[in-house]
């Protein structure tokens, strides 16, 4: 009787707070399979549950997406901000699969019972503990999301983004040119507004548990990209909203952007999302695509419709974050997912079962992180997340106490080198993962390229150093170095010119516009023509900054129809047809707005653009004098060291015959005695050559001298013989005359 009452209570709670999630109930008592190894038991767990009498074996590994400084912020009735650290939640989260369905996804919290999601091929289940149960009973329910019949994004956001990256399946040659995925980390700050707080239970720990559960599932989805979605902190507007949440998502987004600039500046995050409950919204999301590293647009709105549950809401957030990191929605005729629903498919929100990113999404993401700067996703050392102290084997990230980490069973390409279950090397092999590990489980020889240059003047190729399976950090020309024959500057590894920027937007032949165009479009106080925003209001540029505001281009007439009329602005100025685009209509993959001139673009003698202002180059850290430090035989790199020209050796670029140049940072050199020599350059044979040359040079000189003397003697003898013959001839003639 007590169990029935508990089940009815749990059923009522699910109906009240889980939206349209199905109530197809099963009761199960999970059974944990114990391990003799306590260390392995903490990182990996096995549970057996039953659904409809069928046993399922869940293999789980530790999932880390909450940092040690994770806080939950709330406001009291007087408006004061308070924070709580739910430290007990840090070690609860696991992800894995059901052995009976190897392609399944399982995401669970194991503290105070099992709570989370089980996604099989075409069906999803939720599992939660029965409160006050003495027998560890849990309920399992089939999760169903009714079609919310709403768009994910407003037309003015999604349409403009999609026109910049049309649907197409990339050629294999294009994919091969993109670099391999490296571990990255996206730090997200979540805010829950009052209506959603009430809808999810109106209690701090209950709401926190649900949001952590949602982000845990989102993080599981993004592991395909080796991208860890870290929930930096959670803010609950439990008493009243700090901004108005009326209107559509894009209206709320503008208000939220202005609010976060003032109130979230000291709280670490790469992007912030406001979660809003709306019973029947027109669309359920608003964000700026490709802006994850842009502090002016690093925000989004996700609406929770009444028609979906936590799983569907997780997909909404995953799709929005996907747009932030360069993804587009899938064309179902050209993009596919093997035995799963594609996450960037519009129907994924209402679909049940396993969800993964498509081949198109994979290409979009690889392009995003390969071709442009995404440094905000690489600052793991500043986050100090949980998995830094507690490594997770199988996530493809080499962490403390791991000898190798080649990913999970399906991802690992070094199975004969690395045990993907324990992250230990097999036998006496040298390595088991990383770009500088060979298929023979050996470290790549020093001097093997591991990261190609993306700019011939401003970026440098990196090499394996022969002692590590990882590639050395990226090296490029120090910001402020002249490039393109002195008409541009290097900035973050790229030669920044308005011609290149215009060509990327409007096609081949487009160029930076004359000064008159820049002056015109950056002096008007309008939304499409400005030098940035303040309190959500557009600002005209100061005269000194007009070359650093909106990007103005001129394009050939044959390309004039290639741009989207809804986002392109045409101006006729002094016999020039100037072209620009609306702010927010197109984003660079480094997170900056294509509408503006890129940072590092020259705006005057010894000046370049930074954050829409024209600044002197020497004020921006150009503290390495290549003329003195590198003796004029190299340039300064981003580590403040010399990148020497061929024929000169680092660190000070002294002349050395045969040296390929380079720096002490690019992985191609090691210190040997009092000078640097290139690894991979065969110094052994070089020394033998010099020694042999010194030994045989005297013999060569003697031999040459002997040959020379011999020739001289031979010539002298020949002259004497010729003279003798001539004299003999004269004597003979005289005798003939006498007779």
Curated annotation (Swiss-Prot):
Q: Which stretches of this protein does UniProt put in the Cytoplasmic compartment?
A: 709-739
Classify the source by domain of life: Eukaryota
Q: A biological process (GO) annotation for this entry?
A: cell adhesion
Any one cellular-component term (Gene Ontology): membrane
Subcellular location per the Swiss-Prot or TrEMBL entry: Membrane
For the Extracellular compartment, the record's topological domain ranges are: 177-687
Q: Which organism is it from?
A: Homo sapiens (Human)
Give the residues annotated as coiled coil. Answer: none
Q: How does it sit in the membrane?
A: Single-pass type I membrane protein
Q: Which SUPFAM superfamilies match?
A: Blood coagulation inhibitor (disintegrin), Metalloproteases ('zincins'), catalytic domain
**Which lineage is the organism of this entry classified under, starting from the top rank?**
Eukaryota, Metazoa, Chordata, Craniata, Vertebrata
Instruction: Cite the entry's keywords alphabetically.
Output: Developmental protein, Differentiation, Disulfide bond, EGF-like domain, Glycoprotein, Membrane, Signal, Spermatogenesis, Transmembrane, Transmembrane helix
Every EGF-like domain range: 620-654
Signal peptide stretch: 1-16
UniProt domain Disintegrin: residue ranges: 390-479
- Give the function comment from the record: Sperm surface membrane protein that may be involved in spermatogenesis and fertilization. This is a non catalytic metalloprotease-like protein.
GO molecular function, a single term: metallopeptidase activity
Identify one Pfam family in the record. Disintegrin
Query: Outcome of altering residue 344 to I?
Result: In a cutaneous metastatic melanoma sample; somatic mutation
On tissue specificity, the annotation reads: Expressed specifically in testis.
Which InterPro entries does the UniProt entry name for this protein? Answer: ADAM_Cys-rich, Disintegrin_CS, Disintegrin_dom, Disintegrin_dom_sf, MetalloPept_cat_dom_sf, Peptidase_M12B, Peptidase_M12B_N, Reprolysin_adamalysin
Q: Which residues form the propeptide in this entry?
A: 17-184
Q: How is it modified after translation?
A: The prodomain and the metalloprotease-like domain are cleaved during the epididymal maturation of the spermatozoa.
Relay the domain remarks: A tripeptide motif (ECD) within disintegrin-like domain could be involved in the binding to egg integrin receptor and thus could mediate sperm/egg binding.
Which residues form each disulfide bond in the chain?
293-376, 335-360, 337-342, 450-471, 624-636, 630-642, 644-653
List all annotated glycosylation positions: 36, 76, 122, 149, 156, 177, 294, 359, 465, 561, 611, 625
Where the record annotates domain Peptidase M12B, the positions are 184-381
Q: What is this protein called?
A: Disintegrin and metalloproteinase domain-containing protein 18
């Amino acid at each position: 009787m007590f169990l029935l009452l508990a089940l009815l209570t749990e059923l009522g709670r699910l109906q009240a707070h889980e939206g349209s999630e199905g109530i197809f109930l099963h009761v199960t008592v999970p059974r944990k399979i114990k391990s003799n190894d306590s260390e392995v038991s903490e990182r990996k767990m096995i549970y057996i549950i039953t659904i409809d009498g069928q046993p399922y074996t869940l293999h789980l590994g530790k999932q880390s997406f909450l940092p040690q400084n994770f806080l939950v912020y709330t406001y009291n009735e007087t408006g004061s901000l308070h924070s709580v650290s739910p430290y007990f939640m840090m070690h609860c989260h696991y992800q894995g699969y059901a052995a009976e369905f190897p392609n399944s996804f399982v995401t669970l919290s194991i503290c105070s019972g099992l709570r989370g999601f089980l996604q099989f091929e075409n069906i999803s289940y939720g599992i939660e503990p029965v409160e006050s149960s003495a027998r560890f009973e849990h309920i399992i329910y089939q999760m169903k999301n009714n079609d919310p019949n709403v768009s994910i994004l407003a037309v003015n956001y999604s349409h403009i983004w999609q026109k910049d990256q049309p649907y197409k399946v990339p050629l294999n040659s294009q994919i091969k040119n993109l670099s391999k995925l490296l571990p990255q980390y996206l730090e997200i700050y979540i805010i829950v507004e009052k209506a959603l707080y009430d809808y999810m239970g109106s209690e701090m720990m209950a709401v926190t548990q649900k949001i952590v559960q949602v982000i845990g599932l989102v993080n599981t989805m993004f592991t395909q990209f080796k991208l860890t979605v870290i929930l930096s902190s959670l803010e609950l507007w439990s008493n009243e909203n700090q901004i108005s949440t009326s209107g559509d998502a894009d209206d709320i987004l503008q208000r939220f952007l202005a609010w976060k600039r003032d109130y979230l500046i000291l709280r670490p995050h790469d992007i912030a999302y406001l979660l809003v409950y709306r019973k029947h919204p027109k669309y359920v999301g608003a964000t700026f695509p490709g802006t994850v590293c842009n502090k002016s647009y690093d925000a989004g709105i996700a609406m929770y419709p009444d028609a979906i549950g936590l799983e569907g809401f997780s997909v909404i957030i995953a799709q929005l974050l996907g747009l932030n990191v360069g993804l587009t929605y899938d064309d179902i005729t050209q993009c596919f997912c093997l035995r799963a629903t594609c996450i960037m498919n519009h129907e994924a929100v209402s679909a049940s079962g396993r969800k993964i990113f498509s081949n198109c999404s994979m290409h979009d993401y690889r392009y995003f992180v390969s071709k442009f700067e995404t440094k905000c996703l690489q600052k793991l050392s500043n986050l100090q997340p949980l998995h830094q102290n507690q490594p997770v084997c199988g996530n493809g990230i080499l962490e403390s106490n791991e000898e190798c980490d080649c990913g999970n069973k399906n991802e690992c390409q070094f199975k004969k080198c690395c045990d993907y279950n324990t992250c230990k090397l097999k036998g006496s092999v040298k390595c088991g993962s990383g770009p500088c590990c060979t298929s023979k489980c050996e470290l790549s020889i020093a001097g093997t390229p591991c990261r190609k240059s993306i700019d011939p003047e401003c970026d440098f190729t990196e090499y394996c150093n022969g002692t590590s399976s990882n590639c050395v950090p990226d090296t490029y020309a120090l910001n402020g170095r002249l490039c393109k024959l002195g008409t541009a500057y290097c900035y973050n590894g790229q030669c920044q010119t308005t011609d290149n920027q215009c060509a990327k937007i409007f096609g081949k032949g487009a160029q930076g516009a004359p000064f008159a165009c820049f002056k015109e479009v950056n002096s008007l106080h309008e939304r499409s023509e400005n030098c940035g925003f303040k309190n959500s209001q557009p600002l005209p540029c100061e005269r000194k900054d007009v070359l650093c505001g909106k990007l103005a281009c001129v394009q050939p007439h044959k390309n004039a129809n290639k741009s989207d009329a809804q986002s392109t602005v045409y101006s006729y100025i002094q016999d020039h047809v100037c072209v620009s685009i609306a702010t927010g209509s197109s984003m660079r993959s480094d997170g900056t707005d294509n509408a503006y001139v890129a940072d590092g673009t020259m705006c005057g003698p010894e000046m370049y653009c930074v954050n829409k202002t024209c600044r002197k180059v020497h004020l921006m850290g150009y503290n390495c004098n290549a003329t003195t430090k590198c003796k004029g035989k190299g340039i300064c790199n981003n580590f403040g060291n010399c990148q020497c020209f061929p024929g000169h050796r680092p660190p000070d670029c002294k002349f050395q015959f045969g040296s390929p140049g380079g720096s002490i940072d690019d992985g191609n050199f090691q210190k040997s005695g009092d000078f640097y020599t290139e690894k991979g350059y065969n110094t052994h044979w070089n020394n033998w050559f010099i020694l042999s040359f010194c030994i045989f040079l005297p013999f060569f000189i003697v031999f040459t001298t002997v040959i020379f003397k011999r020739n001289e003697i031979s010539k002298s003898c020949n002259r004497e013989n010729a003279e003798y013959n001539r004299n003999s001839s004269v004597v003979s003639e005289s005798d003939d005359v006498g007779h």
